[in-house]
């Protein structure tokens, strides 16, 4: 799956009128499919990450879903578990830095201006359709950034012993 196909898949999941999948679930499914990770159609592990982790406004769900997929990917590509953790963290830090540079924040509340725990604010946000552009744009950013980061041979590869 190339970058454009991943974006098309993400739009199909996220922008579905039933609003079945949130930001974290969408990115998690797309990345699992793109990188041939187990059970790409099951986004269950990511469902509580939407809205900045259980609507708390913390880490953007697209980044949270990406973190889950990166951990799985590193675990499959790097046999040594400790090394896989180092590499996954390094890659995630780069992703977060690049995302922050492009969007000015990594926290959902800062990115959206919404307290999702407030039912009125949440409803207005959904009804406004702003999630279709703002959140979808952030999902697309994560896909694009990971495409670049994961194509770099130095990332998501074990470090050479010194």
Where are these regions (language model features)?
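Glycine/serine-rich anion-binding loops at beta->alpha junctions
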Residues: 49-68
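C-terminal binding/interaction regions
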Residues: 89-162
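Short cysteine clusters
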Residues: 23, 60, 108
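Polybasic, low-complexity association/targeting segments
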Residues: 1-18
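Glycine-rich, charge-dense phosphate/pyrophosphate-binding loop(s)
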Residues: 46-50, 56, 158, 162
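Phosphate-handling active-site elements
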Residues: 34-44, 72-91
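Acidic-glycine-rich active-site phosphate/pyrophosphate-binding loop
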Residues: 1-3, 30-48, 117-119
